[in-house]
């Protein structure tokens, strides 16, 4: 597998660096467990709601992939990638899965693209339309929207958990009131989600995605047949362990999964982010080749 697109993808985000990493910093929230030096105790026991369920509420950011792991992945391309300086988007500040969900697969073992997926990629590439949806001020594809630099916020309430994404100021609603998934949902950017608790793990099922966004920075496509299963477990005050499974039989030969950890952004918050305000990037991006490997 080739990783040239990682370097070019970092360079692309250099044009959008004003949209990443904005946070309200250093506003000490009341009721947080703290160590003797006044910092939030990230290893304290996970909080719970009145009904005894773990409380996922808080501002979170995916754990970055280590420099050592990036060196292993990129090999002799690491130095070139490391020279690209984008605030909040350095090679040691993002998750490898934001660039490619298949990063852990050995060549030939990853789910194969169905003919429809290959045709879609070639069509968009030949038309010069192989680009991120955020370049047109549309929502970034999920899960890429939370696997790169932007922070997000869980707001947990009875019957519903809301995920607020700083990137584009969009949101997901996860209904936990026992309702079933709809039989014929209206396709949308973030789909229709229901959740239930299995012990201390929130299990989320999502269907009803549209086919307009990419799953990751390697331009892996999705279809309206995608079904995504997420499992969130807050192991302590400062960490959520998450697993995501993607099943899209129209695009891929088999389901695939990733596991990540989300880190609490203590005493912080998300900021307003209006893409269309002073937008200057789009006219420079049409037809840009990011080194995609269609395999």
Language-model segments: residues:
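PEST-like low-complexity, intrinsically disordered acidic/proline/serine-rich tracts
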Residues: 19-295
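Positively charged n-region of N-terminal signal peptides that target proteins for export
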Residues: 1-5
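Bacterial N-terminal signal peptides
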Residues: 7-16
